[in-house]
Each structure stands twice: as structure tokens, then as C-alpha cells.
């Protein structure tokens, strides 16, 4: 517990240093309104990264969420284009996202194949389905499906009490998933499954039901992100989630989750989402090309993960150094 919270505090300190450093280059980075409203450009990544954290803590992984976002986005556009009332279209889109997650869970549970392989397959399945729907609707290129009601397109651009709506939804998701993972018996089951699925099964923990809930929640979060993105951009496109994969997984790992399962923290992921998002924005405001900013993001991930590994194993490192000092090589 102490180490985990220490890691989260270190991430928070790094976030402050990052903002101040970019603020020294461009003072706009220190403007509170800019910091709040610029989150709308990347906070949907966080909405997906939160349940993805729970999936990874359970020892699984889902890399299909980007395609799920694209499929849900274009499905929302097709439903609206077909004359379905907007509230019903949104509800059906959310159900579609949850269904995509359940498909992942069902295939993983009943085939016993590695989740990475299964979700790689569904990534292409959902992406292909999105392109098929897009072609059937006549939406080509970057145009997508438009013409949504103004009340819908304004939703993701509104603010409540000075906070943008996407950020508010992210904070609600943060509270829900934090309570679920860290304050409930079901959350403790997630950690146990990640540490040893066989022991969890012998302990009468509903492993399959838990995995279904986790993957369905990731699919549902992807659908929520899709609805927000369509509202934000005013267009439903099949490629809306194409760039989400690496930032989301980076945020989860950077936030402290063990990629092999058994440990992780929702708060850490939330801070890491802001860290990665503001890093990209700060580099863009500093005039750094996208290719360089992507490389720097990867370098940051490597440095921080190595630093965390050292902090978690510092006692073993001290013992190894002591042995080397007492038994120097000839």
C-alpha cells in the first residue's frame, strides 16, 4: 500500500513538474482554463484506461478497444441516419460496446487462448465491421456521418460548474472504478484472479463471471468514449479510436499496473492519463513534431517503468550490491 501510494505521489509530482516546465516555454500551459478544457482532447483515453486497468490487474489484456470505439461510433451514426431517435441510438450503442466486451470475455474463457491473441483477432473483427458499416452508409474518407442534432453535438463541448462535460464523466468513472477495485469484495477478487487464477477458482471466486464483467465494462467504456467523440467532433467515423491503443496501455502501465496481473491502481492510471495527455499537448505547443513527441512519450514510459522497478526491488538491489562489494570480481 505504502509503495503504491508513493508511486502515485511521484506521478503527481512529475505531472506538476511537467506542467511548470512547459509553462516556462509557453505561458498558456499555466492557464487553468486551458488545462481544464484541453483535457477534452485526450480524456476519452482515460475513460477507457480505467476499466482496462482492472482487466490488466486480473491478468488479462484487451487491445480491441480502439476498434470497439470505431465500431460504436459508426453504429451510432448509422442508427441515427436510419431514423432511430437519438436517445435510443445512444442506448443501443452502449449495449453494442458491452456486447463487444462480452464477446472478448466469452472467447477468452471458453477457448483458453491468451487474451492478447483473442483481442488481437477481435480488434480486426470490430475494425472490419466498422468499415463495412461505414461503406454501407456511404461514409468515406474523413467525412463520416454528420447531421446530428445540435443538442447532441453541443453536449461534449458544454461545461458544468466550470468543468468540461468529458472531464466530469471521467471523474465519475474514476470514482466508480476506484470504489469497485479498491473498496469492494469484488475488487479484491480481481487482484486474487490476477495473482493466481487457479487458486482463485479453488477459493470459490466466480472467475468467469468476474472476467465477463471486466471485459464488458471495458467495452461499455469504449462505447461511452465513442459517443463523446462523435458529439465532440460532430461526426461519426470508423477511425475515431484508431490512435487510442498505445496511450491507454501506456497510462495503465505508467500508473503502476503489473502487465502480468495481480497489482495496479485506478488513481495511478488517472494521473498517468493526465501525464501522457499533457505531455503530448505541451510538446505540440512547443512546436515539437508529432513523430518526436511520440518517441519522447515512449522514452518517458521506459524511464518511469525502470524507475518503478528499481523502487520496488531496491532491497534486492542493495543486497546484490553488498554481495558484490564483499566478493569483488578478480
UniProtKB/Swiss-Prot annotation:
Species, as recorded: Escherichia coli O157:H7
Location relative to the cell: Cell inner membrane
Keyword Cell inner membrane: yes
Record GO cellular component, one term: plasma membrane
Pfam families noted in UniProt: BPD_transp_2
Annotated InterPro entries: ABC_transp_permease (IPR001851)
Transmembrane segments: 5-25, 43-63, 68-88, 89-109, 116-136, 160-180, 210-230, 238-258, 259-279, 286-306
Biological function: Part of the ABC transporter complex LsrABCD involved in autoinducer 2 (AI-2) import. Probably responsible for the translocation of the substrate across the membrane.
Membrane association type: Multi-pass membrane protein
Family note: Belongs to the binding-protein-dependent transport system permease family. AraH/RbsC subfamily.
Periplasmic side: 26-42, 137-159, 231-237, 280-285
Cytoplasmic domain ranges by topology: 1-4, 64-67, 110-115, 181-209, 307-330
Keyword Oxidoreductase: no
Keywords: Cell inner membrane, Cell membrane, Membrane, Transmembrane, Transmembrane helix, Transport
Subunit structure: The complex is composed of two ATP-binding proteins (LsrA), two transmembrane proteins (LsrC and LsrD) and a solute-binding protein (LsrB).
Molecular-function annotations in GO: transmembrane transporter activity
Highest taxon in the source lineage: Bacteria
Name by which UniProt lists this protein: Autoinducer 2 import system permease protein LsrD
Chief site of localization: membrane
